[in-house]
Amino acid sequence: MSKAGTKITFFEDKNFQGRHYDSDCDCADFHMYLSRCNSIRVEGGTWAVYERPNFAGYMYILPRGEYPEYQHWMGLNDRLSSCRAVHLSSGGQYKLQIFEKGDFNGQMHETTEDCPSIMEQFHMREVHSCKVLEGAWIFYELPNYRGRQYLLDKKEYRKPVDWGAASPAVQSFRRIVE
């Protein structure tokens, strides 16, 4: 395991079988080592894994654990090509501000907790901008932590494209904790 305590292993076949690729650091393109990915073992850290090279396409956040089939990480298929370690909040502090309009305009809600439904909790249909003041967060396009995922680090996001989304469809979010 690396000095930082991060390690992830990708396997071509289900249940940790077949050829495998180990990583303890960010990798922009590992698809040359594996033709597909059907299972993953995260031995240290929390990882963002991406469908395409250069950290593009669908992204999935995987905390420490075993994922014997791609459905276990909510994958759409067996294609993964890049990965990066997620840097978690030091001190365990989390704070997020979400806005109903772009450029931090309109109604603002501040939270330090996970939210399974922004409609139920904040009476908002979409998130058009946000400020991550503390910690790392995941936005989900559907309620109850489902659908496409977006990783947000500590910074300001003036519009959805800033966090990698094509639209403001954010229906739930949660803190990344280990």
Swiss-Prot record:
Keywords tagged on the record: Acetylation, Eye lens protein, Repeat
Any GO MF annotation of the entry: structural constituent of eye lens
Pfam families cross-referenced by the UniProt entry: Crystall
Coiled coil stretches, renumbered: none
Annotated signal peptide: none
GO terms for biological process, alphabetical: lens development in camera-type eye; visual perception
Ranges for region N-terminal arm: 2-5
Superkingdom: Eukaryota
Residues the record lists as N-acetylserine modifications: 2
Residues in Beta/gamma crystallin 'Greek key' domain copies: 6-44, 45-87, 94-134, 135-177
Alphabetical list of InterPro entries matching this protein: Beta/Gamma-Crystallin, Beta/gamma_crystallin, G_crystallin-like
Connecting peptide: region residues: 88-93
Annotated Gene3D superfamilies: Crystallins
Function summary: Crystallins are the dominant structural components of the vertebrate eye lens.
Cross-referenced PANTHER family: BETA/GAMMA CRYSTALLIN, GAMMA-CRYSTALLIN S
Oligomer status and interactors: Monomer.
Domain notes: Has a two-domain beta-structure, folded into four very similar Greek key motifs.
UniProt similarity note: Belongs to the beta/gamma-crystallin family.
Protein name, entry field: Gamma-crystallin S
Source species: Bos taurus
Gene: CRYGS
